[in-house]
Amino acid sequence: MAEHRIKDICNSNARSVKGLNKDIEIQYLETSDLTCGECSNLQPILLKNAPSRAQRLLSSDTIVYSMVRPNLCHYGYFENPPQNLVVSTGFLTLNLKPQYIGIIDPHFVYLLLTQPWLTQYLHTIAQNAVSSYPSLNPSDVECLCFEFPDFEIQRRFADLFFKIDRKIALNREINRNLEAMARQLYD
């Protein structure tokens, strides 16, 4: 097993909207609109009308992790996000460095960062922050150190958990549709 710090294997906040045409439409994601990997609201808005915190542009295989109130689990993994997806500066974005592709699985990194014990640990750090609300610094996440098994083991493990997550999401969608159908029948 190899031991790596997040900052050694990932680039943080690598892409921003700086230099983009301000008249383009973006899909904006606020921290409260993402919980445990599930988006509840993407806001289409012109970049020039977006909140000043709409700065972080996503690319493929991006991990987003809220720096505010980590106990609320505002984090997610974006495998193939829309080209114009922008998230709040309240998120830390992490992308695997090119030299670690095929050595570290980004899905596995996401699974490590979203473990309940780690969420609690980061929340404890956030509560001690010198601000009016519990918040983290990017370095609090970047300095985390993990042991990584062989790439194939990481990939299999992450694949299994992501399949389970997709099945859970599908079941939730089916339940929402069934609930809507029941309302139509009884209203």
Task: Give names to the regions the model predicted.
Residues A54-R56, S60-L118:
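A short beta-sheet element
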Residues G19-Q27, H123-A126:
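Short coil/turn segments at secondary-structure boundaries
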Residues L85-F91, N128-A158:
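A short glycine-rich beta-alpha junction/loop motif
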Residues R5-G19, Q27-S66:
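Sequence-specific dsDNA recognition surfaces
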Residues I104-D140:
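Short, positively charged
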Residues M1-K18, E147-D187:
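Non-catalytic DNA-recognition/assembly elements of restriction-modification systems
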Residues E30-P44, P70-T89, Y121-T124, S131:
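Short, ligand-facing micro-motifs at secondary-structure edges
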